[in-house]
UniProtKB/Swiss-Prot annotation:
Keywords: DNA replication, DNA-binding
Encoding gene, per UniProt annotation: pcn
HAMAP family the UniProt entry points to: DNApol_clamp_arch
Protein name: DNA polymerase sliding clamp
Example of a GO biological process term: regulation of DNA replication
Gene Ontology MF terms in the entry: DNA binding; DNA polymerase processivity factor activity
Role: Sliding clamp subunit that acts as a moving platform for DNA processing. Responsible for tethering the catalytic subunit of DNA polymerase and other proteins to DNA during high-speed replication.
UniProt record similarity statement: Belongs to the PCNA family.
Gene3D superfamilies, per database record: 3.70.10.10
CDD domains found in the cross-reference section: PCNA (cd00577)
Quaternary structure and partners: Homotrimer. The subunits circularize to form a toroid; DNA passes through its center. Replication factor C (RFC) is required to load the toroid on the DNA.
Domain of life: Archaea
Amino acid sequence: MVKFVFPDAREWKYIIESLATIVDEANFVASPEGLKLRALDPGRIAMVDLFIPSNLFEEYSVDQETKISAVLDDIDKVLKRAKSDDKISFEVSQGRLIITLSGRAERRFKFPLIDIAGQELPSPKLNFTVAAKMLSDTFRDALKDASLVSESVKLKAEDESLWLLARSDKGEIESRFSIETGSLVEIDVKEAAEASYGIDFLDKIVSKAYRISDILGLRFATNMPLEMTFDIAGGGTLKYLLAPRME
């Protein structure tokens, strides 16, 4: 039997919208420990890694590890119908995913499970030299600013400051984040680093995922992938790994 109930359908809406920025179909794995997903976008530029421990659910019944393969757009459309005080439950039965919204009325949606080809993705082993935590909406706003002049941004870290830089024939934009200004919560620079990333993916991810957590964790190194972590209240995590853009 597989069934899990989450008390806030809106938070699930934010999670699903965030996942849908890089994948159309998702191969969730439900185990007694919790719900997880690891997937690559079709262009193999970005990877998403989601884990929600079983204790975050109001009800969680999973006897054995079970794959739940579904079209994210189907789930997203259901969640757009959710009311502010709705609970949401997911159940797997007879080859179908059953989603129930419970509030003033109980509304049930049923979708066929799908087959998703592909191998299990290993956890990347990377050596980051910069780790920082900052306000997620501040990072989102800086990306919006950078998109005015460029299709890519450079992240640069030195001492106790982090910069987001954008440059093109249209102009230049520079955003500096630090603990003293309140935009950074913490920063650890083992070695000065800089790397460039495409704004398109960054903006898609952050503009959806920032609603999940006020704080965004960033880790990177020179010309290495960027890891972005959004903590889900109670112990869950939503992580993205974005390949660098080589200049």
